[in-house]
């Protein structure tokens, strides 16, 4: 618990859960990072002073042994994830107090350094940076936007998320792997009683090295995770701004787009409700992929590296997000095949593909090797899964009021206990504004070529929204179109 909540003093109620070799075993199993701790116990009034008490891990390694009523110290060379309290069978232990002998984490120094660096950066862009005042003000706005979208993190704890514990487990697994000499980390050696767990072979973890490295310099798990999320929010604001600005050639459009996207409902649900860290990280780079495709087809063909880097970062964030992005890229390229074949633009696409593939081989090769050499549950997945039953009800796309703590339920339950699947007010207004804009331009006889790419993005958005609902024939495609099963 100290490992999770950065406390320096904790008191536990003890409850007998079993017996072993003349010793009574008590809960809870305590998680402590490396360090020195003072230990004290409380016993029932009938307990004497000559009963032995131990603290040991599951492997039987004893860290403390003393008589009832004594206080003592334990020293841990590494993080112990489950320490167990045992006493002589005749003694009745009721409480244990664990207090750190000195500071456990370096959080306050780290946070002070972040504040100092943040203020230094703000002063630099305001008074010493290149460009006009509007650029400095835009940077200030984007930073403020990222910090505002992080407000659920401004507590001393973490909000519960569906997948939160798994991602915290991944971060500490990487930290343990680095500490044991692995790089890149492929196996969480301390998991499964020391047998190890190969999560890193199947989950991309590039960005999780940031909080893992913070863990290695003494930052608590909570602060390390929050640091990653705040950085993700600020990065989302900046990338969304420059992506929208790059396509629209408008700073104002970039700011509006950044605000709508950064404060989007589904992005917030991924971060704070579902704890879907991979999907949340992948959403940083969706706008960058759109900008990259734009430059390949219509913009500066020499900026092919934008698409390449966007694909690399997407791949290193979320495999499913990568697959969806790849499908959309292919669709856009096919729609604009004539533009792609002009002026040597296709060579930019080839360079982007080769560059992205080369930078991802360090992950792709172990992934393919592990997938085809291991007996995995996913290979026995039910091909008759009812996708349509889990699709959204159209009303949900525009629903403003819902419980963020819900889950994705079947259609038979209607909106009961449903997680928010709404676009949000901002995105809905933007969608309506785009529709009015294109209709008005059509009536005024404006050339479609002036905003061809934007119109294509708008139409694709409508199609994807429709495909996310139960109105789309997912079941029919599953039963009659083989590729849809994949």
Segments from the language model and where they lie:
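Glycan-recognition and processing domains
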Residues: 1-36, 47, 56-57, 97-99, ...
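Membrane-interface transmembrane helices that cradle and orient dolichyl/undecaprenyl
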Residues: 289-305, 314
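Start-transfer (signal-anchor) and selected internal transmembrane alpha helices
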Residues: 104-152
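Transmembrane-embedded, aromatic-rich helix segments that form part
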Residues: 305-308, 321-336, 367
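Membrane-interface helix-loop-helix junctions at transmembrane boundaries of multi-pass membrane enzymes
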Residues: 130-133, 252, 339-349, 432-474
